[in-house]
Amino acid sequence: MIDIKFLRENPDVVKENIKKKFQDKKLPLVDEVIELDAKSRAAKQEADDLRAKRNQLSKQIGGLMKEGKKQEAEAVKAQVAEFAERLTELEEQEKTYAEQVTKDMMMIPNMIDPSVPIGPDDSCNVEIEKFGEPVVPDFEIPYHTDIMNRFDGIDLDAAGKVAGNGFYYLMGDIARLHSAVISYARDFMIDRGFTYCVPPFMIRSNVVTGVMSFEEMDAMMYKIEGEDLYLIGTSEHSMIGKFIDTINEEEKLPYTLTSYSPCFRKEKGAHGIEERGVYRIHQFEKQEMIVVCKPEESKMWYDKLWQNTVDLFRSMDIPVRTLECCSGDLADLKVKSCDVEAWSPRQKKYFEVGSCSNLSDAQARRLKIRVKGADGTKYFAHTLNNTVVAPPRMLIAFLENNLNEDGSVNIPTVLQPYMGGKTKLTPKH
């Protein structure tokens, strides 16, 4: 959510930003906000003036009564009563206008960074850099579930009976590999100075609307029936929510947290659920990282965050690349975002395994996450988030890039301590 003062002073700039995000249907919101905001402020000003007059008249009543001027005092009382009725009307008007302004403001996208490429969708995302040499072996790479089945490592049929499409059972060495990756990612981030956190796996609606747009909320979140609770789609939401309604001392920033959590997503929309596999599913596990920092430091932290993911994947011998997300591919609260993609030898192309985002003060403004400077000045913090690793997708990249012709899978050195010292996984059939 952008600063309403900025919108008042720069309506054309805000409209141009909406156009750059190819959301022209939202253009009328800018004029509506300006109109309603003016009405809200006018109602407030009139109410403030009336209160001042009411207070002045109220003081006269006591004096008139002492002077025995009861009739004049009663006349003043009647005038004060009229003010009270009008004040109630004005307060209700101000509240109604302000609530609609807030709703409209939450629909207006954040101002994108000038460096963001302009384009309507992810087909216009721009490659930034490649890390590691993509390799295509001279033997056929099976589909990832077929590789897992060689180790008796996945059961989609049983999961379908228990929970429906979009769920899975991981078994044996594949399940152990899944846990090993999470444990390694946790220690990797702790070694980089992040504080490990196990957050709530459910959040209230005020946190949901504070961290994401309504469109994202509708497409992702599962609501608990009869409760003001949602299952998290990613732990960044509950980690950022930790700072709701806080004033943080400037010298204590930045806060850098990393967390493990299960994640639950409806995956409603264009992509939907994958029929057979673990690429796009309703439930998965993820190691996440977030930063709450001073505004002038958010660009620096943005580069550090995505580099963490690149370094993690490269340490497991997986080639990756980074893509700059174009304007139309950015969620409404994001100022700038890049995807980290891993190489798929089977498909001979890269696929998304993580996303890094700078949200500037959008989440902080909604959640009232403020910073108190050394001089006592208060301002909104900046928030960022990034995927460390999401094992279901990472397992696809891992198995394909470490598969041998005989069906065995090499275990990179960094994971061996988490796999009981194993250097290789041998298929059962």
What is each model feature region?
Residues 1-134, 149, 153:
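N-terminal alpha-helical targeting/anchoring segments
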